[in-house]
Amino acid sequence: MGGVSGGDYILETHRLTKKFRGFVAVYDVSLRVRRGSIHALIGPNGAGKTTVFNLITKFLPPTGGKIFFNGIDITQEKPAQTARRGVIRSFQISAVFPHLTVLENVRIGLQRSLGTSFHFWKSEKTLSVLNDRAMELLEAVDLAPFASVTTVELPYGRKRALEIATTLAMNPELMLLDEPTQGMGHEDVGRIVELIRKVSVNRTVLMVEHNLSVVADLSDTITVMQRGSILAEGSYTEVSKNPQVLEAYVGTADE
């Protein structure tokens, strides 16, 4: 098996399967994510994409199959163990603290990465050592001018940028982005696309995304899922010409 050697592939799944009381959500999925690439997972609603994310990040145990990260079998690990290895997921629903400032949200991400999670009672002086790094991350996602803004007041697209900043604070080697442009207007989509391109330098990104123009713009490799299994894989040019892929998307009005 290639998974035991790591090498060019940062993440590999071998025949990954998940069943819920007889319903097969994911079946026989063998995925290989090349180190340093942007890899998109696409498919109609109910194709199993989010379940695959949940399996990779250990929010669900697999019914069968194996998961390798950097050549190490992580199939039985707890979510926190896998996160410590550098597999970090940005959630589809904006996972930020709405009543804290933008800076404080990123600082919490830094605290998590240092193992001082949620010590809100620590003195401001103690926490201020994290501020410089937090500001660097905010600058990376063009949020430095919003540092002192209460998060609830941020526009939606900026909240998604903040979510990416808090994910970066966890120092991901493999960054999983779940629907990063969902619910955005055209201008915000463009901003997030450029942001993903920027933060993907020297790291690997695996993303679930419905917006096919975003997928075409960003992805090195695309895996198309349908009914829990892999239907096709390749570049955007390759998969967009695949008759099975075209058929899978016909009639899915929300795609």
Name each region found by the language model.
Residues 2-255:
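Glycine-rich phosphate-binding loops of nucleotide-dependent enzymes
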